[in-house]
Every structure is written in C-alpha cells, then in structure tokens.
Amino acid sequence: MTIRPDIALPPDAAPPPEAPAKMSPMMEQYHEIKAANPGLLLFYRMGDFYELFFEDAEIASRALGITLTKRGKHLGADIPMCGVPVERSDDYLHRLIALGHRVAVCEQTEDPAAARARKSVVRRDVVRLITPGTLTEDTLLDARANNYLLAIARARGSAGADRIGLAWIDISTGEFCVTECSTAELAATLARINPNEAIVPDALYSDTELAPTLRELAAVTPLTRDVFDSATAERRLCDYFAVATMDGLAALSRLEATAAAACVTYVDRTQLGKRPPLSPPAREATGSTMAIDPATRANLELTRTLAGERRGSLLDAIDCTVTAAGSRLLAQRLAAPLTDAATIARRLDAVEAFAVDSGLREQIRSSLRAAPDMARALARLSLGRGGPRDLANLRDGIRAADEVLVQLAQLASPPQEIASAMAALQRPSRELCAELGRALADDLPLLKRDGGFVREGYEPALDETRKLRDASRLVVASMQARYADDTGIKALKIRHNNVLGYFVEVSAQHGEKLMAPPLNATFIHRQTLAGQVRFTTAELGEIEAKIANAGDRALGLELEIFDRLAGSIDAAGDDLRAAAHAFALLDVATALAKLASDDNYVRPEVDESLAFAIEGGRHPVVEQALKRAGEPFIANACDLSPGPAQKNGQIWLLTGPNMAGKSTFLRQNALIALLAQVGSFVPAIRARIGIVDRLFSRVGAADDLARGRSTFMVEMVETAAILNQASERALVILDEIGRGTATFDGLSIAWAAIEHLHEQNRCRSLFATHYHELTALSAKLPRLFNATVRVKEWRGEVVFLHEVLPGSADRSYGIQVAKLAGLPPSVVSRAKAVLAKLEANDRGQPKTLIDDLPLFAITARAPAEAAPPSEAEQLIDAVKALHPDEMTPREALDALYALKAKLPKAD
C-alpha cells in the first residue's frame, strides 16, 4: 500500500473520482492509490509508460502538449488518458514541476510474471512524491540555483502587529535557515529567499491580505493545521535531528521552531520516510541583511532582467565562478547583502588576497573546475537516488581538496575566510577517498542497476561470479558457430532481448529449413518477422539460466558494495558538506577577484557611517555591454554624504533630457552600494559607503491588471512604501515620480515627496525628474543638490555626453529623442511648432509658475522683473559663461561664430 502523504488538497483542485461498484482490478488499484495521494498528478506505471487518467490526464495533456486519448469507460463515460515514456519521464516531470504541479510516481513493485502466477494485477506503490521544493535529481534542478522549500507560520498580534516565522531548506544541498519578521517585511524577505515552493497553513492560504503576496512569489501548498502545531514543533525537530533537546540546535523563537518543524515534516512525508541530511537550522538575525523589496529587485535586475532572463542581469555580469556550487553561493550573497561591516571586511579580505596574486588565483580556479557538486551528490546518495558517478564525485572532491590545500599553502598569512575554508578542506577522510579509488571502475554507468561500476580485483567473490557469467557468454558465441556449421546457414546469429531471452535468428528463406525435419527437433519456432524468423533451443534455455543467475549474483554483489560505500559516505556527511561549502566560498572569492582584475574594480571602504562617496562610478552591466561593442563607459561621481564636510547634498535632484543617462546613473549607484555590502570590489576609482540597511528603487512601472492597478497606481504604491519605510540608513533612488498623471498633480506629488525625504526620512537619495521647477527647492532645502546630465546641441541635433555635473537642465529635448526613435518627420515638425508656441505663451505670462501655485509659495518669491540687459551686457555675459580649458577646438570655433552673430549689424 502507498504511504499517505497527508498533503491537503488545494481548495480549487477537484477530488479524485469515486470508484464505481464494479471495475477492472487495474482500475480499482488506480483509484485506491489516487485516493491516498490527493492533489498530486499520479504517474501510474504500466510497462514502459507512465499513464495518467481522468482529470490528471487532462491537466498533463494541456501542460505538456501531448495527445489526450481514452481507455475504457467510467460511470458510462470515456476515461481520459495520456502517457509519457518512462525513459523520457524526467523531461516531462521537469516541465510539470516548473509549472507548479506536484507529482506522485507509482511504480510496478513486482515482476509481471509473478502477478500472472498469482492471477492478480501487478503490485504498484507510490515510490516518490515530487514537488517544486523537494527536488534532488540533476535532471530536474538548475545547477546554478538553489531549490528552496519555504514554510511560513504566523502569530496574531494586537493592532495588526502579526509576526511571521519562516524556515527554508534546500534538500539537494542540506542548507537550512530560519528567521522571523513582521508582515510589512514579508514581501521583501520572500523576494530575497525566492522559494520554489511555499507551504502554509490552510488559514494563511485563504488570508485575503497575505495570499496574493505568497502566490506571486512561489507555488503555494496549503497544509493541515497539525503540520504547523507549535506545541509539537520542538519534539518533531529533535526527532528529525536525533537529539534529546533543543539545546543541540540553534536558539529558535517559537514561530521559527514552528516553521522549521513544518519544513522537516513535509520533507519526511514527501520523501516517504527517507530523511535527507540537513544542517541544523541557522538563525538569521533581524536586520542582518539589506532589506530589498520585490519591486526594487525587479527594477535593478539583480538576478533576472525584467524580461525574466538571467542574461543581462547583475548576477550574469559578475558571475565568473567555475563551479555550480560557487554560482549558487554568489546568487545567495547577491540576494542578501550584509549589514555588518566586520563580516563584509572579511569577505573583502579574501577577494583582495586573490586579486593581488593572479598566479595563485588562476591555480585555484583551475583546480576548482575539477571539483564536482559534492553537496548534491551527498543528498542523492542519502535518499537512495544516487549512482556510481555520485560516489566518484565525492572521491574526486576529496582529491581536489588536497590539490587546493597545496596551492593555498603559498599564502603566508591567509585571511580569516580563506583560513576557515582551508580547515574545512582538511576534514574529509583521505582513507575514504582511497577506498573509493580502489572500488570504482574507470568507466562508470549512470545507474547502479546497470552494474559494471566496481573495479576488477576489488572484491574476489565478485570477480569469480563475473568470470562465470562471461564464460557462459563465450559458450553462446561457440554455440552460434556450431549451429551455423550444423545447419549450413552461415548467416545464423544468436541474439537476445527481454521478451524471448536468447534466440536463434535466420533470414526468412532459411526459416523454412529450420522448421523442417530433422532440424525442427532442435530448433523451436518462436517468432516470424518481415525478414527474419526466430527460434529457441533447449540448450540455449539452459545457458540463459546460467548467465542470468551469474549476472544477477554479480549485480547483487555490486549493489551490496555500493550500499556499503554509500553508508561510509553518509557517516562522513558533515565533513564532506563542510568541504563542499569551502569549495563554493573559494570559488566566489576567486571569481570576484578575477572580475575586479579584469574590469578595474576597487575595494570599497564600508563602515558604520552614513557616508556615500563614489568617485568614477560605473554601471557594471552597461559597462560590459559597451565594452563588447567597443565603446567606453563615461564614469561619474556621486557624493551623498552628510555632515559639515559635505561637498554636495544628501539628496541629489537630477535633471536632464531623455536618453542622457539619468536612469543608468541612479541604478549604478544603487548597484555599487549593493556590491560593496555583498563583499565584492566595485566599479569605481574610489568608494566609501556607510552601511545601507534598506535599498529602495522606484524606476519604471507597469500596469498590474490582475489587481486592478494602473501604471500610476503601481508607481504611487511603490513610492508610498519608500516614504513610509525608509530610515536614515536607507538608500533611495526615484525616477520620474508623478509622470503618470496630470502635470500639476505629478509635479505636486514629486515636490511633496522630496520635502518628505529631506525632512522626515533624511536618507541618502537620488531623485531624477523632468519637472525642472523642482530645482527651485534647493533654495530652501539645504541638503538638496541640483545635478544635471550634460548634453550638446549641434546643428539642431542633440549629443548626449553622459556626464553628471552640478546644475540643472532647462530643457528635456523630448522632440529630439522622438526624432531619434523614428517618429514621422511630419509629426516631429508639428511637435516643434507646438512647442515653440507653448514656450512663447509661457514667456508672455506676467507671472511664473512659482507664483501661480500656492504649493510653491513656501519657496523664495521670484524677484521683480528686471529690465532686459543691453546688447553689450549680453555679450559680456556670454563671454563669462565660456570655459576655454574645457572646450574642444571645434567647440571654441563654434562659440566664436556665435559671439560674432550677436554683434550689432552695421547700417
């Protein structure tokens, strides 16, 4: 019988079909197994196929694009059916899991011949429950990404102050973490963890406030209340980790323990009692990582672009790792930048050690390329899903550890993080490595059931059995030669398949000869095909039995050896996992050092101040794209540091035309801060960054039609979150606030937002806008600094120089950008005419906007209109505005022509 997983049925899932009073034994068995596994697609093994029936078949047919057929009837209606071949099932499983489906794999657990002897249906049992968060096979996993299962528990508080406990594990690597947060922090925490599956109590699944957030981020599986029972949580954790008390584990809060217990309970059930080895839950302290909400992660394209692609993201740009485990660790660090300056410094020390020693760095990277994914090999072996190549991976990992240790010995005084890695690499047993080396053959099969993975000479009993098996096969070869001579049929062959066993095969024309006396007494006709006829003999049957028995005995001995070796590995699991993590750590450190060396990154100074001073900053992703195109990136400085020595302002108000690079400038400074707190060198000449506790980005917006939100509503929701949550340690980048509504509405909102950031949040901020009127705020807000992106006009065209300078822009050059975008010439021409008229009308108004709007009355009043300057004064002002040292010869010549044009014309 199947072990019932007790996984609750999602509210929108149909129950399994009821079994009628009379049905075939096979269909009766199917209904029984399906009823024990509600809410999962049942892959029901029938020969060489997994078949799906009823609603499962309809779901799988749509999801996989395979033909929906029918098999018999149920309650008078056709039974929907579809199937997938067993040998290609991993491909189909991968697609179903990626769509959020969960699957129960039901195998035949006895030989069909035995079932026929019993005159009964073949026994079948569910041997695996596959869910998005509990994968271990390489064929189903992304090698460069973690596969997290997340459990969420909630405790109700007064006045809506609920607390959330979270626990997440990756059973393919053994990682296990817990934390606690408020409901306001939940979205940012979920975005950081990025789980593949979330398990929640039924009540939380139905919660109107939280459920939409959960379903946006992961496949959500609701479970019954007992899984989240806080009264039994500690007992379940102690049972899983085989400890007497929680003293042997981390000090967890009640909520954290509840979520952690839910995780291990779900794993225990989905793995049908097999327990993957997990590290004890590591507790993440509140505030230990930079908080980044989902919108900011998306806007900054940290791990995926807005189109959902890895290519073009920050992770893609900086990932120089050479191992899958290193790539996973880098992604983890990028998702959770640290807020502890001392820990950041230790990471930077490791990167610097390899940045200054390119020879050692490349030696380490070369050795790491040979290091396999030890953590995932361990997990597969512990769950009984491993193969001979997993054993070899662990053998090769220990060998690589010795090689890396020899190389690291060149460091006279290794930094703390490297020293810790060296200690971890020394932990695995070298005797275990030697034993694996003696046991495993050079050429290994993928599956242990294929045999042939034990080296000749390792086990004498196995060698003897193999000799007997192989000798029998030589007898078959000699029999073929003898049969060919006896019959006079030189083309006679002895072949083998799983249906007939060993058989004699001849052409159709020779078949009649073997079916005629006297040869028919020896050769028994079994099968006629289009061009061949097949026969068996009593002698062949005897030999086949000997070969089968010898082969079965040989495979049995090999499987015993495999289990013995796997047991030794399981006993050494903690040491091997520590070495696997050390490899990943060294891979990340050497990869970031290579990035720094290749792209001229510098070590940032990260401290507990509120400083933010970047000299020669660059956008890491855009710079790489330009480099591939053979173009330079224009670096820019940014100083948001507070205090008396402040050169500029804590809030920069950035104006300039479209396409000038404002958004790139905003993003690059956010990414530099993030990289610094990840523990990476940064793309700049110099960088000093005081710890950023929260990073906010409101750059671009799109409709959220599913929630009935317009583009402007999405923009306002994101802006509200920033203004309500940003502390003085936050870094805020805002682009074009208020552009999605009427001009005066948008201008008013942007104005008020700047004042709030300045007076209430008091955080480091970059604010880009096309509302040039906002630059007047610098007169009343002392920490507001106006900056602009430099452009040049040349013969009616605009040239973007991408330089950020003090000052403000008076034009946005929107029509020029529209022309570059390919608007029809007639539209561009008409737009210029309309703009000229609007600007003329604006100049003719007796009062400026700052006088018109009460909103702006708090700023300094505009001075009385002065008499227009004389022509001589205009010439003097024009000359004063020139900066010869900053001009190219061409620009100087143009300026001279412009001055000449201003001279009064002679009568």
Swiss-Prot record:
An example Gene Ontology biological process: mismatch repair
Biased composition (Low complexity): 1-11
Keyword Nucleotide-binding: yes
rRNA-binding listed as a keyword: no
GO cellular component, one term: cytosol
Pfam families: MutS_I, MutS_II, MutS_III, MutS_IV, MutS_V
GO molecular function: ATP binding; ATP-dependent DNA damage sensor activity; damaged DNA binding; mismatched DNA binding
Region (Disordered): 1-20
Name of the protein this chain belongs to: DNA mismatch repair protein MutS
Organism: Rhodopseudomonas palustris (strain ATCC BAA-98 / CGA009)
Species classification: Bacteria, Pseudomonadati, Pseudomonadota, Alphaproteobacteria, Hyphomicrobiales
GN (gene name): mutS
